[in-house]
């Protein structure tokens, strides 16, 4: 199935973020949510939904998100995405394109991916950031249905994240390039420095083009202090070369990583 979700934002006359254009091809759907207490006071809260039982063999999913100048969007998902079992030679793919205009802000934290036995899933995420824009983007993936004794029973998982800043001359300058490639039949993914005995991995990328390295360093230190209180999680926080930081987490419960990323998101929104 070829499925597509496309949405863009605009600023209302009262200075609040609204949906400008919205198109969804099943099983995708987006609903807007009431405004809750949030550091992004004029932002829009929305939920990405799906009527499908999961990602199936041959599925091609495309997501396009475009934020207008001065708008802010917090986008979550409804539930876990399950990548279902596939026949040998089959696969599914998702491509996400995100464009952040000048002074726009996006928080995007999909629920975890669960890789079922014999599944193959490839995803690519491309993000372009305008001047002084801000991004909080998370990914969480489970190595299988652990309670069903499925650990690394999938065939392949790959995730490529590329983030660029748009320069005055129209050219794109790379800020982040991150790649996860898991091939259980060819890799020892339980080895030291890999997944070891953990069953879930999470990555959270934060970029704020309005902040300098000294300000980012303060945020890294604050998050490191906060993460010291977390139990049963292996957490690493690194400052990027410029404008941001990355959090990498290993754990045994998806909900624990999800709540941690939501907590970090609230903190980053407020500074």
Curated annotation (Swiss-Prot):
Pfam families per record: UreD
Claim: Transcription is one of the keywords in the record: no
Cell compartment(s), UniProt: Cytoplasm
Molecular-function GO term, any one: nickel cation binding
Primary location class: cytoplasm
This protein's UniProt keywords: Chaperone, Cytoplasm, Nickel insertion
GO cellular component: cytoplasm
Family: Belongs to the UreD family.
Function: Required for maturation of urease via the functional incorporation of the urease nickel metallocenter.
Subunit and interaction comment: UreD, UreF and UreG form a complex that acts as a GTP-hydrolysis-dependent molecular chaperone, activating the urease apoprotein by helping to assemble the nickel containing metallocenter of UreC. The UreE protein probably delivers the nickel.
Protein name listed in UniProt: Urease accessory protein UreD
Source organism phylogeny: Bacteria, Pseudomonadati, Pseudomonadota, Gammaproteobacteria, Pasteurellales
